Amino acid sequence: VLNRVIDFMLSYSQSNLNPEEIVLKEIFEEILNDYSHIFDQENIKVDSSFPVQLKLTINKQFFRDILQNLIDNSIKAMANAKTKILKVSYEALSNNLVIKVSDTGVGIPVERREQVFALYYTTTQDKGGAGVGLYIVKTRVESLKGTVSIEDSEFGEIGTTVKIVIPFKN
């Protein structure tokens, strides 16, 4: 955890120094591939939807940090779930990139949905959570002029959906 905080602080200080053009589908697939052994080991079914080939000029490491932290959280949240499904998608709406990461984990009660973005707030301490991941997601998304929110789960009564909206120019 300390290493993640230090890495975060170092890369944050370099924030927008290195924006580069990325192909979203490639980044999403690369990150999901990085986790494939964990998905197999934990018996997690991955449902991904990347319907459009979209290029974005953005800090690549910030973008990776966002996705990796959301996936890490989903894996922890599904540790004791009977059905383990991770759904990752993006779409372009107007001049916004809308990313959704959903899981069939324990879920987040409505009254705690704002709290989870605070530094050191965790509901998964017993699974190694330190309350840093969603804080990193929030600060990274905000540095990209975007918003992040917790929505009702796409899976009904179980799980969580995190929605990120990042503006871009066509």
List the model feature ranges, each with a label.
Residues 83-95:
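Short beta-strand/loop element within the Bergerat-fold HATPase_c
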Residues 108-120:
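Short conserved segment of the HATPase_c
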Residues 61, 68-73:
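Conserved polar catalytic motif of the HATPase_c/GHKL fold
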Residues 103:
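Acidic ATP/Mg2+-coordinating residue in the GHKL
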Residues 146-147:
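Conserved glycine-rich
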Residues 141-142:
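Detector for a conserved hydrophobic position within an alpha-helical segment of the HATPase_c
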